[in-house]
Amino acid sequence: MATSAVLSGARSMLRAASSRSAAASTGRFASQAKSAPPLFRATARRSPLLSPLRNPVELSFCVESLLPYHSATASALMTSKLSISGQTYGWLSDACNDDV
């Protein structure tokens, strides 16, 4: 019973010490963060080229131009496969066996 009391007392002392050291380190880092000058300053004046493009959807044309070339090929192939009429079989192997 005495050992459990000693252990619980030791735990509470460790918790108190760790919370004090955490509070001290947080305060130290907060004071350093406040005193450090910002690395990047936002300018109040924007570029005249980017001012009409405020919406990310409006910038989607840039993303499409960055797609790899195989995506354009795959897109064209998919479009051509989808445009096949419903009466043809397209690339199915069963369509090649006309003599059976």
From Swiss-Prot:
Any single Gene Ontology cellular-component annotation: mitochondrion
State what the entry records as the consequence of deleting this gene: Failure of fusion of the polar nuclei during megagametogenesis.
User: Where is this protein primarily located?
Assistant: mitochondrion
Q: Mitochondrion as a keyword?
A: yes
The answer on whether this UniProt entry bears the keyword 4Fe-4S reads no
Q: Where is the transit peptide?
A: 1-29
Name-wise, this protein is Protein NUCLEAR FUSION DEFECTIVE 6, mitochondrial
User: What PANTHER family does this protein map onto?
Assistant: OS02G0230000 PROTEIN, PROTEIN NUCLEAR FUSION DEFECTIVE 6, MITOCHONDRIAL
Keywords annotated in UniProt? Developmental protein, Karyogamy, Mitochondrion, Transit peptide
Known function? Required for karyogamy during female gametophyte development, when the two polar nuclei fuse to form the diploid central cell nucleus.
State the Gene Ontology BP annotations: karyogamy; polar nucleus fusion
| Organism expressing this protein natively | Arabidopsis thaliana (Mouse-ear cress)
Compartment(s): Mitochondrion
Source species taxonomy: Eukaryota, Viridiplantae, Streptophyta, Embryophyta, Tracheophyta
